[in-house]
Amino acid sequence: MSFSNPRRRTPVTRPGTDCEHGLSLKTTMTLRKGATFHSPTSPSASSAAGDFVPPTLTRSQSAFDDVVDASRRRIAMTLNDIDEALSKASLSDKSPRPKPLRDTSLPVPRGFLEPPVVDPAMNKQEPERRVLRPRSVRRTRNHASDSGIGSSVVSTNDKAGAADSTKKPQASALTRSAASSTTAMLPSLSHRAVNRIREHTLRPLLEKPTLKEFEPIVLDVPRRIRSKEIICLRDLEKTLIFMAPEKAKSAALYLDFCLTSVRCIQATVEYLTDREQVRPGDRPYTNGYFIDLKEQIYQYGKQLAAIKEKGSLADDMDIDPSDEVRLYGGVAENGRPAELIRVKKDGTAYSMATGKIVDMTESPTPLKRSLSEQREDEEEIMRSMARRKKNATPEDVAPKKCREPGCTKEFKRPCDLTKHEKTHSRPWKCPIPTCKYHEYGWPTEKEMDRHINDKHSDAPAMYECLFKPCPYKSKRESNCKQHMEKAHGWTYVRTKTNGKKAPSQNGSTAQQTPPLANVSTPSSTPSYSVPTPPQDQVMSTDFPMYPADDDWLATYGAQPNTIDAMDLGLENLSPASAASSYEQYPPYQNGSTFIINDEDIYAAHVQIPAQLPTPEQVYTKMMPQQMPVYHVQQEPCTTVPILGEPQFSPNAQQNAVLYTPTSLREVDEGFDESYAADGADFQLFPATVDKTDVFQSLFTDMPSANLGFSQTTQPDIFNQIDWSNLDYQGFQE
């Protein structure tokens, strides 16, 4: 069976529908495809029977009276709806009723943006809408060729109505406090955790014959786990303990079941993860937790036994909604721990922990000083520190501000304020009129006295170093003490600190040095080595007897070549004058520059030979004179005037002085000249010995090469030497 689309049939025209003013559409006008997108040359004369005619569009009111009448009708309809809603409302009816005043209007057509219906009140069929005023005819046809818009709304409404009949799952009363609106989003126990709970908790409880009465509680646990009423071990603990009183016939049976459950849960904890043990924010499982849990179970069992015996709570313990709960006591109030009490209408107070009557009129325990007084009156500490009177006013305890204009400093103690204000007034003036401090002044008298002693005193007080013969003197005692601390290791005990941490010093005891006033000769003065170890040392395996450069130079009094500003001039001083002129110097100092600053390190003089050899005789280099290394008493050697030119020949002049060039130090075998006497070399021959009688020549005849060697035809090498230049004739007979 075929029929044409009703929307494309020729509309039925009715007489009298045309508006005289031309505001209505002519329904006889037809639209053709060609006329829609093209401009025809001539209008069509006839209309086909299948042409589409759009329905008449609704128009707004064009007259003022129509607008006013429509507003009045709308207000009347709204007031009528309010009256109907109030007439249906009842204060005594507790059953919920659908809200009659519900705005279900949408800014867009409901057929396009209809949300899923979740409220049953919106699912009811709306009554026919009353028209404010007559409208133009709108053709609405319900036929089999509907586009299907809104079919999803009907199916959604049907589903919403069916959902009302289903029972919504509710959280258990035991775990409802911990559950939130996002219970469905919480993770459930894993399959492994469920098996561990069944093996270590549920099975032992079911196998114990004395706990048959609690079997329904244990058997209901798997269902609670599946419904997420139990999502951790703590929920299982609450379920078993809080539901046990319903099945317990005696307090002993209740204690047996609860303690057994606690032991089973304690054995199960180690098999579960932290998330599966407790909920977020709960107290974790520890040994202390299980001890407290058992104690609470014992107390609850005792209360349960008391209730079973009496049949109900005592009359004085009956709970009334009008009772007032109050926190009473405290260490700061009456010296006892704070506790919750319940105050009845007659004023009787009962402890919620023990159930005993609390005497609220009892005087607090006398304390020497309560914590509340210290907490509330913090100014008491400030008063005790500032030595203020006990009943000082807040103005007296308040910080004191400086009265100097522009100064914003505050002080808690008046003495600190007075001391600070003197830095502005500077009352101590210098008595010398020409001094600038005569007008400017000093904050303290001590500073003024120190200024006068330093600048204006003719005979200032001097503070001498206590370590004689140290010549240090200072006008200030603090400077002298600092000198003794740094130079002599003296312990400087400071009465006041400046806030800086004093560095720790090793060996703070003062080291006394024997004075050198009775020492007359330099040879008796001990030689002190430099305390700082040398940086560049020669390998001991290569040169075991060779000292380092710095040690050798410091020991023998020679300075390194890098010190250019030092005066190397030598003075021939007598022992008496040397000893008397250097008694004021200390034997040594611990400074790093004492070698450069002092005139003589060890207060010793140098004895120089009467005539020094020429530089050509010692390869243009000369060794510095040696100082004594060992404490050896020797007689000073007298020098004999040289009559002839000094030579290096062993058979030459008797008192010739021999030197070892410093250039041969690299090939030295470790022989040193540490046993030299007072800086002078030994004499080869005594001055009173006749060399012609005692010492003979080394060779009477020239040795021959034929002394057991196989080569007898060797030339005589001694014949090639000219012996006349060596003054050899003087040693022949």
From Swiss-Prot:
Q: Which SMART domains match?
A: ZnF_C2H2
* Alphabetized UniProt keyword annotations: Activator, DNA-binding, Metal-binding, Nucleus, Repeat, Transcription, Transcription regulation, Zinc, Zinc-finger
Q: Which terms does the record give in the GO molecular function aspect?
A: DNA binding; zinc ion binding
Q: Which InterPro entries match?
A: Zinc_finger_trans_reg, Znf_C2H2_type
Q: One GO CC term of this entry?
A: nucleus
Basic residues bias spans: 1-11, 132-142
Q: Which GO terms describe its biological process?
A: regulation of transcription by RNA polymerase II
Its function? Binds to the promoter of the cbh1 gene and activates transcription.
Entry protein name: Zinc finger transcription factor ace1
Q: From what organism does this protein derive?
A: Hypocrea jecorina
Q: What is the lineage of its organism?
A: Eukaryota, Fungi, Dikarya, Ascomycota, Pezizomycotina
